[in-house]
Amino acid sequence: MKIEIVVIGKLKEYIRPAVKEYIKMLSSFAEIKLTQIKHAKGYKDFDKSLKKEAEGIISQLKESDYVILLDQSGRSCDSISFANHFHQLIQINSSIVFVIGGPFGVDESLKKRANELLSLSDLTFTHQLAVVILLEQLFRAFKIINNQKYHY
């Protein structure tokens, strides 16, 4: 099972240790790849920046990738529901790509390419923190799927 997490921008120093730790913990369940896409800078309007970022992401996706875009308008669920849904997805998809947009959101073309939209919470998080939260939920999901204890 291959899982890729694509995020706009370079991860900040204080986020990297948590990301590294979760990727290490997840390695017994899946191959995790983190891809950081450069912010599209130099554009005076956000729409052009978002379009450029989306083009960069979409160009790296394979047609067979199952793409889940993290977006505030996406479907929300609790950890058990996420684990159950994720379990179904990994049984039929060999490659799942989670996409986390930058601080200004994502272009509509990326939403159209996504197979589904997922909201991590009704709360708003920085895209940097969303990476850590997603990794934690993936780890929790694998523990639930495999009937393993998590932290209790």
From Swiss-Prot:
A GO molecular-function annotation: rRNA (pseudouridine-N3-)-methyltransferase activity
Catalyses which reaction(s): pseudouridine(1915) in 23S rRNA + S-adenosyl-L-methionine = N(3)-methylpseudouridine(1915) in 23S rRNA + S-adenosyl-L-homocysteine + H(+)
Record localization: Cytoplasm
Enzyme class: transferase
Sites where the protein binds S-adenosyl-L-methionine: L70, G101, L120, S121, D122, L123, T124, F125
Cross-referenced Gene3D superfamilies: 3.40.1280.10
Keyword Transferase belongs to the record: yes
EC number: 2.1.1.177
Disulfide cross-links: none
Keywords, comma-separated and alphabetical: Cytoplasm, Methyltransferase, rRNA processing, S-adenosyl-L-methionine, Transferase
SUPFAM superfamilies listed in its UniProt record: alpha/beta knot (SSF75217)
Cited HAMAP family: 23SrRNA_methyltr_H (MF_00658)
Function: Specifically methylates the pseudouridine at position 1915 (m3Psi1915) in 23S rRNA.
Subunit architecture: Homodimer.
Family of the protein in this entry: Belongs to the RNA methyltransferase RlmH family.
Protein name, UniProt field: Ribosomal RNA large subunit methyltransferase H
Organism this protein belongs to: Pseudothermotoga lettingae (strain ATCC BAA-301 / DSM 14385 / NBRC 107922 / TMO) (Thermotoga lettingae)
Lineage: Bacteria, Thermotogati, Thermotogota, Thermotogae, Thermotogales
Gene behind this protein: rlmH
